[in-house]
Amino acid sequence: MIMKRLLIIYLALCFWGECSYAVEKQKDIEILYNRLLEEYLSDSIDVSQAEKDLAVMQTDGSWKDIDYKTVTFYFDAERHLKRLKNMALAYSKPGNKLFHEQELRKKIILGLDYFRIANPDSGNWWYRDIGAPSQYMIPLLLLKKELQREDVTRLSSYLVDKTDNMAHKGKNRTWVSAVLIHKGCIEDDYELIAKGFSSIASTIYVEEKDDEGMKRDNSIHQHRPQLYSGGYGMSLMSD
């Protein structure tokens, strides 16, 4: 009987410990979410442009003046994501007439869904792996608290973990890591966030070979042996 009671107490303590750990994880996610939210809400918004884009959005969530199908080095579909970001900022930022306007919220979700399904391509891999996801994640994060769980799961499926691709080094690695961190924050997935930060930390080393990364003389190489301290390097250090 004593052993049975001890076992029950032990299991209860284990359960309590797991619950406490889960609560702490969620607190960390909320801290990260609020910091990201604060950063994005500091951006300026063009309410007039958001109204115009809202008015001319098609019923499927697209815009007629954007080419979603032609695959070229230039990525015209990027304009779709920039519009959604401005609209999401207008919806999320207090003090403007579009703040928490429900028709706007519906159209932003529609626009995210359209982009996710259409999955526009580019002749430049950077837009596929980094550029488009880095812009798609912002309006989705801004609307996170306004979405049902199934909407979050569906929409965040566009954000794919690219950190396992070892070809992504230096600044490119911090970019794909940021996408993963946002995905984890949007989905309340602590492990994805931790993996993203670990991926960023992996860039902090001296690259001895003729490859991308930090060098012994404190310079930064990107695009293989090219010296890029003032471009990619400055951006990498700011991360």
Report residues per predicted region:
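Aromatic-lined, polymer-binding surfaces characteristic
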Residues: 51-239
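Functionally constrained cores in energy, signaling, and assembly domains
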Residues: 10, 46, 85
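Sec-dependent N-terminal signal peptides
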Residues: 6-15
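Boundary at the C-terminal end of the N-terminal hydrophobic targeting segment
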Residues: 19-24
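Hydrophobic alpha-helical membrane-insertion signals
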Residues: 27-50
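N-terminal secretory signal peptides that target proteins for export/translocation
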Residues: 1-3
